[in-house]
């Protein structure tokens, strides 16, 4: 065990100076270089160091680096590191991607993607640019109203993004968002794609409306409400969600990963019936989580619906199964 731990630790290089970092960029130019900007006082950084050590075992062709953000401020400032943990990805000494926050599955995905994507050349063929342009077009059209921002609507990571979210919410505007910190290629590419150098950026039907100043002007002139689509009232939204599939389960987590014991048990029961069903993760939408309690007058989760009607929670589903009534109800026969 001790030997394995030492081997894993050795696979992650610790950098203590700007000079050492620049030298490492030069020496490891041919491979993917993943740099973890961390701090010893942040427990989530320790967890991500463990994740990185495991990834280093799996991807021996990738170079993994730990850099204490506050100990090497010149590097942190150069790459706009404002919080820890933050991960930067380099190829050919060029930064190609970024991940802010302790997101182990996302880190694993990015390492796998970039490690398998072959050599990256900033001055390469035109095809990657065409691919990026197509990707940006899809992203800007991903929803009728798309906000490209720093962070998420729940956790904006700059004052301008926070103000933008507040304005959109105040006007009950329905929008989806993209965290530009999660994808460096999109962050840089969108500036050129739309000839707009700053964030946040708001798009309607794929067309750039503008940044915060423009949105404030549109709000002042009363035009904002006519340009952006309105969010449906919560009750309408809950009605649509509960009818999204014939059998709908509102739970903590999803089919692949239940995040509480009650949700896990109800998944096992539903899976044993062979009936198709869909799930909604209430942990990802606080409005739905709270609203559904009042909508159905049922204070706890999970909640099971058939054709938009509440069947009940885990205890009721267990009773129905024991009585042999569950399958007919799920099939809509009762």
Curated annotation (Swiss-Prot):
UniProt key word Nucleotidyltransferase: no
UniProt GO MF annotations: iron-sulfur cluster binding; metal ion binding
Chief location of this protein within or outside the cell: cytoplasm
Sites of Phosphoserine modification: 116, 119
Binding positions ([2Fe-2S] cluster): 158, 260
Domain (Thioredoxin) ranges: 2-116
InterPro entries from the UniProt entry: Glutaredoxin, GRX_PICOT-like, Monothiol_GRX-rel, Thioredoxin-like_sf, Thioredoxin_domain
Function: Together with BOLA2, acts as a cytosolic iron-sulfur (Fe-S) cluster assembly factor that facilitates [2Fe-2S] cluster insertion into a subset of cytosolic proteins. Acts as a critical negative regulator of cardiac hypertrophy and a positive inotropic regulator. Required for hemoglobin maturation. Does not possess any thyoredoxin activity since it lacks the conserved motif that is essential for catalytic activity.
Protein name: Glutaredoxin-3
Organism: Bos taurus (Bovine)
